[in-house]
Regions:
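Internal gly/pro-rich beta-alpha loop/helix module
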Residues: 136-158
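Active-site-adjacent beta->alpha loops and helix N-cap segments on the catalytic face
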Residues: 88-90, 108-126, 134-142
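Glycine-rich phosphate/pyrophosphate-binding beta-alpha loops
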Residues: 80-86
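An N-cap/entry alpha-helix motif that binds or orients negatively charged groups
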Residues: 1-69
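A short, Lys/Arg-enriched amphipathic alpha-helix followed by its capping loop at the start of a domain
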Residues: 74-76, 95-104
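Acidic (Asp/Glu)-rich catalytic clusters
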Residues: 96, 101, 116-124, 147-149
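Hydrophobic faces of well-ordered beta-strands that scaffold small-molecule active sites
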Residues: 76-79, 104-108, 127-131, 155
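Conserved, mostly hydrophobic/aromatic
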Residues: 21, 78, 99, 157
Length: 158
């Protein structure tokens, strides 16, 4: 299967499973702990129907939305994922570039492979920082100060 033949989530998942080494695919495809939250979230989509408005003009479609105080062109954002260079050589820079291209927000994990400052300097699109709280309060303080200095727009506590 080639990328140009991917038309839905399952197609992309099948392609990824074929191309990415097993342990890395399982990391991306899996979920935390017992995966109960993943199951509940997935099942909730069974109750959601996307119904297109047919025979209506598309010249004035506005998908912009405000999320966590950030103005986005799309009602989606690229969520933070740790260790992104495992599955793309540019890591967070690739996600930030895609988010900037489409005018949406992207997230950087505190377990990211690219520094907050580097990503922030290259891409001015809204950015959120997924912060893992540590027992070492001085480490927490340093990480929060670094995010603030980089100009991060939104903090997410994990």
């Amino acid at each position: 299967m080639q990328l140009k033949h991917c038309h839905n989530f399952n197609d992309f998942r099948t392609l990824a499973k074929r191309r990415i080494p097993g342990p890395i695919f399982n990391y991306i495809d899996g979920a935390a702990d017992d995966e109960k939250t993943y199951d509940r979230n997935t099942k909730s989509f069974d109750d959601c129907d996307l119904v297109p408005s047919i025979l209506r003009g598309t010249e004035t479609v506005d998908m912009s939305v405000t999320v966590m105080g950030q103005e986005l062109n799309l009602p989606i954002y690229c969520s933070p994922t740790a260790l992104q260079r495992l599955f793309h050589h540019q890591g967070e820079n690739a996600v930030a570039a895609a988010a900037a291209k489409f005018g949406t927000m992207f997230g950087v994990s505190s377990l990211g492979t690219v520094s907050l400052t580097e990503v922030r300097e290259k891409y001015k699109t809204p950015q959120c920082y997924q912060f893992y709280f540590h027992k070492d309060r001085s480490l927490n303080k340093a990480m929060l100060e670094s995010a603030k200095a980089a100009g991060v727009d939104v903090m997410m506590l994990t």
